C-alpha cells in the first residue's frame, strides 16, 4: 500500500503558486482572490463568480489537468496571461469528488453579499467573499461524494511523549453520521488499529509525521495523511475545547479519558471547526472503544484474509461481498463495522445470533421487514446535511420517509415475542416524534426540487400567506398572457410576444419591421416605451407591464422567502430530534443486518455457532464462504467440506495444533483461511458455513497466508514473512488462533526447515495457542512423536495412471510428497522439463534427504522448549544488566569509579548467569 500524503499539506504544494503573485496592476476582484488564496495556500481555491467556481494561476493549471477541463486565461499579471478555469456551481460536487479522490483539499469561497449590497458601499466596491468550508477526504457530507455502503472516517492520531516513552490514542469521526469514537493504542498495534477503522484521512502532528522513527508507519497507509501544526493536539486546553463543543461544564461523569485520548478528541474537534468554519456538525459524544471487547486482527491478517477487499483492492471476492445481503446504506455500514471488529463477549455475540435465529423462524416477517426497508433513506446523513446548512428538501423528505418506515415497522413488530436485540429496537421506535412526523407529511410537496432556492417544495394549503403569494404570482402570469393577446390585437401584430430575461425583466418584442406600428403616432410612442434594439428585433415596455412585473417579482420573492423560513423552522425541529434520529437509524440498520444474515444463513445452509469462553475450536463440515459461492456461480463441482478440531483434549492443559501437509493445489490454503473466516463470522454474530461449530472465544487472530514483497520499506518476501511470524510468536496467547502457511519457504531448505521447526515448538510450548500450520517440510511431521498436542493431518489425493487427483479432503496422517512435478505437468511445462524433474526428484528421494525427519528428532532434544517462567527469568536477567549499563556515564567516572563499575557488572553476571 502506498500512503497518499495530502497534496496540500505544504509538503508538496502542487496547487499553490510557487510564489504569491504581486498585486500590482490587478483588478479589485483579483486582489480579493489573492488575499483569500494567501490564507488558504494549502488548498485549491474554488472562487465563486456568479454561477461558476473559478480557479486562477497554478490552481487553474493543476485543476484543469486533473479534471480534464479547458484551461483559458483572464487578464494579465506582470505582462503574462493569468491561467484560469472554472466549473459550474450546480455540478461542482462531481468535480470535487475527483479532486478529493486525488488527494486535494479544496477551499470553497462563496459570495457573502449580493451585488446590490456591494453597490451601497460604493460604485467600485466588489462583492464580499469568504471561505465557508474546507473540503477534505475525511469531512465529506454530500450524497454524491459518499459511498453509501461504508463510513467516511476522519481519524486523528495523537502521540504523547512521557518519561517512559510514547503513548498513543486514536479518535475517528464520520461527520456525515455523527459517529465519534476513541481508543488508546500502542506502537506495535497502531497499524492494526488504523486498518481496522479504515479512515479516509488521518490527521497527525507535523512533528510526529516527520519523526524518522515512525516513517515506516506512514509509508504503508493507504489513505490521505494530513500533517497539522502540533498545537492542534494541545492537551492542556483539550478538556476545555471538548466541553465547549458539546456544551458541557465538565467531562466528569462522561468518561475518564486519558491524556492521549483527550489530545486525539480535541484535535478532531479543532480540525472539524477549522474545516467547517460556519457550522458545527452535531456529533455524538466520543465513545471509548475497549481493546479487549473486540477480536484483535493485525494488519497482515486483515489483508491476507481479504475481509473487506481482495489483495488487489476489489470488493468482489472479499468476505464482505460474499455475506452482504443488506438493503440499506446504514445496514451495509453496520455489517462492515461488525465484520472489522468481531466481539469477544459470548453474551453479546449470542444477542446477535438470537436475532438471526428469530428471523429464520419467522421468514414471512423477515420478508415483510426487508420490503419495508428496501431503498429506505439514509437518515443520519440527511440530518447531518440539514444541520450543516447543506441539506435540501429531499433530505427533509428522507427524514419524513424514515419516520414513516419506523411507524410501519413498529406496528409490524408489536405483536411478536422478540429477542432482546430486536426488543431494544422496538423500544427505540416507540419514541417516534409523531408531531414532527405529521408536520413533515403535511408540509412537503410530492415532487421536490433538489435545491431549496428553487422553491416549490411546500405543499399547497400548508401555509395561508404562502398560498396567497403563490396565487398572486401565478395569477399575474396569467394576466401577462392576457396582456400579450391584448397588445397583439391592438397593434395587429400577431407575432408580438411578451418575454422575460434577468437584465430587462418583462418586455414586448417585435421585429424591426413591425416596430413602426408601435412608434408611428405620438399616442403609441407614449404608451410603448423603447428599451432595446437588436439585430432583428426591437424591445418595448409599458407602464402597466412594469407595474405588473413589480407585483409578480414581489409575490415570487415573498413566496420564496416564506418557503425558506418554513424550511429553516422545520430544520430546527428536525435537528432537535437528532439523538432520536440517530438511534432509530442505528436500529433500522440492526434490523437490516439481522434479516440479511438470516437470509444468508437460509440461502447458504449456515449453522448457529456455539460461543463460550473455553479453548474449544471444533468445526464440523466447514466450508470457505467465498470459494463455495464462487463455485456455485460457475456451476462447478460442489465445495468439499472438512472438519477441524483444535479443542482441548483429555489430560491436556492447552488446545491442539494441527500440522497440515499435502500437495500443491490440494486445498491447504483454502482450509487454513476458511477456519479463520469461520471464527470471524461467528464472533461478529453471524451463522457460519458448517453443519456445527463450537468456538471458544478467540482473543487474537493471526494469519500468515500468502506472501508479497514490501518494496516501500525495503523488505523482501522472506523478510515480510519473518516480521509477521515474529508478531505472532510475540503476541499470541492460549486463547488466540494462529494460521500459518508454508513458513520458511522464502529461504534455503535447511534455513526454512529450521525456522519452521523452531516456530512449531515455540507455539506448542510457549504460546499454547490453537493453531493450524501448513508445510511442505515433511520432516516436521516427526515432531508429533515428542509434541503431544501436535497432530498430523494431510490433504487427500489419488494417483490415477500417473496423474494426481486432488480430493480436497483433510484426513489424519502425513503426506510423503508434495506432488510438485505433477502440478507442473498440469500447468503445461514442456515434457522434457517434466521428465528431467522426475529423474532429479527420484535421485534426491533416494539419497541423503531420506529419513531426515526422524534423524532430527533423535539428534535434537527439545532444548529450546523453555517454559514461560524460564523465558521471563532470562528477560529479567537481561533487564538487570541493561539497567546497570544505563546508569553508567563513562565521561563522568574517575578511573577508580570505572573499575568499581566494571567489578559490579562482573558480579551481576556471576550471580545471574544467562
Curated annotation (Swiss-Prot):
Residues 1-24 are annotated as: Disordered. Pfam families: MutS_I, MutS_II, MutS_III, MutS_IV, MutS_V. Residues 8-18 have a biased composition (Polar residues). One of its GO terms (molecular function) is ATP binding. Keywords: ATP-binding, DNA damage, DNA repair, DNA-binding, Nucleotide-binding. It comes from the Bacteria. GO terms for biological process: mismatch repair. ATP binds at residues 662-669. Gene3D superfamilies: 1.10.1420.10, 6.10.140.430, DNA repair protein MutS, domain I, MutS, connector domain, P-loop containing nucleotide triphosphate hydrolases. SUPFAM superfamilies: DNA repair protein MutS, domain I, DNA repair protein MutS, domain II, DNA repair protein MutS, domain III, P-loop containing nucleoside triphosphate hydrolases. One of its GO terms (cellular component) is cytosol. NCBIfam families: mutS1 (TIGR01070), PRK05399.1 (NF003810). This protein is involved in the repair of mismatches in DNA. It is possible that it carries out the mismatch recognition step. This protein has a weak ATPase activity. HAMAP family: MutS (MF_00096). Belongs to the DNA mismatch repair MutS family. This is DNA mismatch repair protein MutS.
Amino acid at each position: 500500500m502506498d500512503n497518499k500524503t495530502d497534496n496540500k499539506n505544504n509538503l508538496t504544494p502542487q496547487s499553490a503558486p510557487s510564489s504569491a503573485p504581486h498585486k500590482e496592476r490587478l483588478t479589485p476582484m483579483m486582489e480579493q482572490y489573492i488575499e483569500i488564496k494567501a490564507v488558504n495556500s494549502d488548498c485549491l481555491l474554488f472562487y465563486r463568480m456568479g454561477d461558476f467556481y473559478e480557479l486562477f494561476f497554478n490552481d487553474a493549471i493543476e485543476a484543469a489537468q486533473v479534471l480534464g477541463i479547458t484551461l483559458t486565461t483572464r487578464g494579465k499579471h506582470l505582462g503574462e496571461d493569468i491561467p484560469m478555469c472554472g466549473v459550474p456551481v450546480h455540478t461542482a460536487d462531481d468535480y470535487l469528488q475527483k479532486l478529493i479522490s486525488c488527494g486535494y483539499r479544496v477551499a470553497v469561497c462563496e459570495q457573502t453579499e449580493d451585488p446590490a449590497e456591494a453597490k451601497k458601499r460604493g460604485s467600485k466596491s466588489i462583492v464580499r467573499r469568504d471561505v465557508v468550508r474546507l473540503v477534505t477526504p475525511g469531512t465529506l457530507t454530500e450524497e454524491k461524494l459518499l459511498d453509501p455502503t461504508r463510513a467516511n472516517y476522519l481519524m486523528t492520531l495523537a502521540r504523547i511523549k512521557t518519561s517512559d516513552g510514547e503513548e498513543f490514542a486514536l479518535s475517528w469521526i464520520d461527520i456525515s453520521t455523527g459517529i465519534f469514537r476513541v481508543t488508546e493504542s500502542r506502537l506495535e498495534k497502531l497499524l492494526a488499529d488504523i486498518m481496522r477503522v479504515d479512515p479516509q484521512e488521518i490527521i497527525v502532528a507535523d512533528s510526529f509525521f516527520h519523526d524518522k522513527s515512525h516513517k515506516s508507519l506512514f509509508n504503508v497507509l493507504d489513505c490521505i495523511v494530513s500533517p497539522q501544526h502540533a498545537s492542534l493536539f494541545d492537551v492542556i486546553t483539550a478538556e476545555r475545547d471538548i466541553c465547549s463543543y458539546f456544551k458541557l461544564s465538565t467531562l466528569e461523569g462522561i468518561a475518564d479519558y486519558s491524556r492521549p485520548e483527550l489530545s486525539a478528541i480535541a484535535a478532531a474537534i479543532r480540525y472539524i471547526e477549522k474545516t467547517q468554519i460556519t457550522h458545527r456538525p452535531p456529533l455524538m459524544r466520543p465513545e471509548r472503544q475497549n481493546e479487549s471487547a473486540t477480536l484483535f486482527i493485525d494488519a497482515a491478517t486483515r489483508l491476507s484474509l481479504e475481509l473487506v477487499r481482495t489483495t488487489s483492492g476489489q470488493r468482489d471476492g472479499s468476505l464482505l461481498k460474499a455475506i452482504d445481503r443488506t438493503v440499506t446504506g446504514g445496514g451495509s455500514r453496520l455489517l462492515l463495522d461488525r465484520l472489522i471488529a468481531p466481539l469477544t463477549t459470548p453474551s453479546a455475540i449470542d444477542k446477535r445470533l438470537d436475532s438471526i435465529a428469530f428471523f429464520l423462524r419467522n421468514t414471512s416477517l423477515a420478508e415483510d421487514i426487508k420490503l419495508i426497508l428496501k431503498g429506505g433513506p439514509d437518515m443520519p446523513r440527511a440530518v447531518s446535511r440539514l444541520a450543516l446548512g447543506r441539506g435540501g428538501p429531499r433530505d427533509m423528505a428522507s427524514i419524513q420517509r424514515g419516520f414513516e418506515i419506523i411507524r410501519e415497522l413498529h406496528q409490524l413488530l408489536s405483536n411478536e415475542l422478540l429477542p432482546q436485540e430486536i426488543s431494544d429496537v422496538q423500544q427505540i421506535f416507540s419514541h417516534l416524534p409523531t408531531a414532527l412526523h405529521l408536520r413533515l407529511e403535511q408540509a412537503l410537496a410530492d415532487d421536490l426540487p433538489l435545491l431549496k432556492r428553487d422553491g416549490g417544495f411546500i405543499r399547497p394549503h400548508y401555509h395561508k400567506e404562502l398560498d396567497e403569494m403563490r396565487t398572486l404570482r401565478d395569477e399575474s402570469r396569467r394576466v401577462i398572457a392576457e396582456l400579450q393577446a391584448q397588445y397583439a390585437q391592438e397593434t395587429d401584430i400577431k407575432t408580438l410576444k411578451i418575454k422575460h430575461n434577468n437584465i430587462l425583466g418583462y418586455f414586448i418584442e417585435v421585429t424591426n419591421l413591425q416596430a413602426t406600428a408601435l412608434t408611428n403616432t405620438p399616442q403609441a410612442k407614449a404608451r410603448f416605451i423603447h428599451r432595446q434594439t437588436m439585430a432583428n428585433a426591437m424591445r418595448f415596455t409599458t407602464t402597466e407591464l412594469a407595474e405588473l412585473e413589480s407585483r409578480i417579482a414581489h409575490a415570487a420573492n415573498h413566496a420564496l422567502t416564506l418557503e425558506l423560513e418554513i424550511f429553516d423552522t422545520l430544520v430546527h425541529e428536525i435537528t432537535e430530534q437528532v439523538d432520536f434520529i440517530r438511534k432509530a437509524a442505528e436500529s433500522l440498520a440492526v434490523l437490516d443486518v439481522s434479516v440479511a444474515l438470516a437470509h444468508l444463513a437460509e440461502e447458504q445452509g449456515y449453522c448457529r455457532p456455539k460461543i463460550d469462553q473455553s479453548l474449544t475450536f471444533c468445526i464440523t463440515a466447514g466450508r470457505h464462504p467465498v470459494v463455495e459461492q464462487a463455485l456455485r456461480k460457475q456451476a462447478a463441482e460442489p465445495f468439499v467440506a472438512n472438519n477441524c478440531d483444535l479443542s482441548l483434549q483429555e489430560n491436556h492443559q492447552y488446545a491442539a495444533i494441527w500440522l497440515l501437509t499435502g500437495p500443491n493445489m490440494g486445498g491447504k490454503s483454502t482450509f487454513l483461511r476458511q477456519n479463520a473466516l469461520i471464527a470471524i463470522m461467528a464472533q461478529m454474530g453471524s451463522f457460519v458455513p458448517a453443519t456445527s461449530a463450537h468456538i471458544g472465544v478467540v482473543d487474537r487472530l493471526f494469519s500468515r497466508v500468502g506472501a508479497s514483497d514490501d518494496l516501500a520499506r525495503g523488505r523482501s518476501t522472506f523478510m515480510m514473512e519473518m516480521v509477521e511470524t515474529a508478531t505472532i510468536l510475540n503476541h499470541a496467547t492460549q486463547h488466540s488462533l494462529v494460521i500459518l502457511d508454508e513458513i520458511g519457504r522464502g529461504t534455503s531448505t535447511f534455513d526454512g526447515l529450521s525456522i519452521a521447526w523452531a516456530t512449531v515448538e515455540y507455539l506448542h510450548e510457549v504460546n499454547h495457542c490453537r493453531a493450524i500450520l501448513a508445510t511442505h517440510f515433511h520432516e516436521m511431521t516427526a515432531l508429533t512423536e515428542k509434541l503431544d498436542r501436535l497432530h498430523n493431518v494431510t490433504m487427500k489425493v489419488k494417483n490415477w495412471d500417473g496423474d494426481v487427483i486432488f480430493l480436497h479432503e483433510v484426513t489424519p496422517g502425513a503426506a510423503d510428497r508434495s506432488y510438485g512435478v505433477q502440478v507442473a505437468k498440469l500447468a503445461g511445462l514442456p515434457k522434457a522439463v517434466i521428465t528431467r524433474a522426475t529423474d532429479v526428484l527420484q535421485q534426491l528421494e533416494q539419497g541423503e534427504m531420506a529419513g531426515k525427519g526422524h534423524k532430527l528428532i533423535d539428534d535434537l532434544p527439545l532444548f529450546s522448549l523453555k517454559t514461560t517462567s524460564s523465558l521471563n527469568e532470562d528477560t529479567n536477567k537481561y533487564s538487570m544488566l541493561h539497567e546497570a549499563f544505563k546508569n553508567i556515564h563513562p565521561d563522568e567516572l574517575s578511573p577508580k569509579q570505572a573499575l568499581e563499575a566494571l567489578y559490579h557488572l562482573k558480579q551481576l553476571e556471576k550471580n545471574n548467569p544467562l
